[in-house]
């Protein structure tokens, strides 16, 4: 039995000397000092010894086990240190290599134009209000001087939303103009100077010039003795700030049911200088927004007496402004999520 222990010690030590990795050490431990290893199996034969030899056998067994355990611990520490050193070498960073710039996000071009518009009007004393996208037919049409069956309703192809109330029609707003009524009824009887940006929806075929969803910025000014001159001065100042300082502005008569008189506002084409080109369709002018003096009926519906109060309103699209500034010929680019297009507006 003692010879068996000596043989195990000799072979285990030789095997341990050939261990080169932590995986090899784990295999060695299983074979020699583990619960089912050679040393454990040798200890089971102690019952076959003469009782007087058992203490000596146990002492010898313990000495061998302790010696192998100490050698194993020493080797394990050395292998772990070597493995850590190798890992650090493999993960070392070469500081002489050129750095890689962070991938920085960009604002959507519509967002850029919207923020620019808001900034310009904020410096003119306008507040920014937000209004609901789902509106009643009353606010979207009737209170804006378009009662049921009014022919002006045909100017907007409308999405109707199912309503729990059969007596109330609910729509996705076709313009931001319903916000005028909400603002007037909230601030009445105070003067008003606000812009209302937001999304609008129209049941139109998607094309290079139209989308079913688009953004719009509504403007509303209510006060005493507000005139067409105030409208022209405000919008001319906006055009100069938005496009260029010496831009020429013209006002063409138009029609909107909620303003009277109504105008379309154009600027001289800054691409061709008014000579006529593809962008301005050879006219020399670019349409940028619609505007007009608030209709007396709309004032009354908002809680203001048109005999005492007056005001003007205007509406524009951030996508339209962006298309003009950057010569973009298809509005669908704004909603295509094409990185090649969006990254041009960083």
From Swiss-Prot:
Binds 2 magnesium ions per tetramer. It holds the Pfam family tRNA-synt_2d. One of its GO terms (biological process) is phenylalanyl-tRNA aminoacylation. Its cofactor is Mg(2+). Mg(2+) binds at residue 260. The keyword Aminoacyl-tRNA synthetase applies. SUPFAM superfamilies: Class II aaRS and biotin synthetases, tRNA-binding arm. One of its GO terms (molecular function) is magnesium ion binding. It is found in: Cytoplasm. It catalyses: tRNA(Phe) + L-phenylalanine + ATP = L-phenylalanyl-tRNA(Phe) + AMP + diphosphate + H(+). GO terms for cellular component: cytoplasm. Keywords: Aminoacyl-tRNA synthetase, ATP-binding, Cytoplasm, Ligase, Magnesium, Metal-binding, Nucleotide-binding, Protein biosynthesis. Its EC number is 6.1.1.20. Belongs to the class-II aminoacyl-tRNA synthetase family. Phe-tRNA synthetase alpha subunit type 1 subfamily. Tetramer of two alpha and two beta subunits. This is Phenylalanine--tRNA ligase alpha subunit.
